[in-house]
Amino acid sequence: MNWQDKGYLLSVNKYNENSSIAEFYTENNGKIVGVIFGSTSKKIKSYLLIGNKFHINSKLREDGRLGYLKVEIDEIKTPVYLENKKKLFCIIYCMNLIKILTAENENNVEIYNLLEKLFKIIELDNWLVEFLYLELNIL
């Protein structure tokens, strides 16, 4: 089963010398987990940051199994906020919250739209109040 989608990186863990296991929340497929080969190369490693938006090509052998992912950066989101610890903490907090609260392969467009809204909220002046409302919507 092959498909293409866009999604946000929720987590990434080193798998072996050249690969990583990554978890994404996608628009049409929900939360997915897969292996990214060559993720330790300088080219890919530099943008595999939690919160960045990717274009994902997935190759699954069977439904419910760990698949192979090819990723291309779509939008760089997180590095913009590296100098602001509060905003960076809120991004990572939201990603972990979604990682914990959602089930694999269950599509929920509302959650994806909340992730899109998160990065719009963080740019506002009163972002902290809006972030609290966003958090309540996620829960």
Predicted regions and their residues:
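Non-catalytic alpha-helical scaffolds and adjoining flexible linkers that form interface surfaces
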Residues: 1-20, 25-139
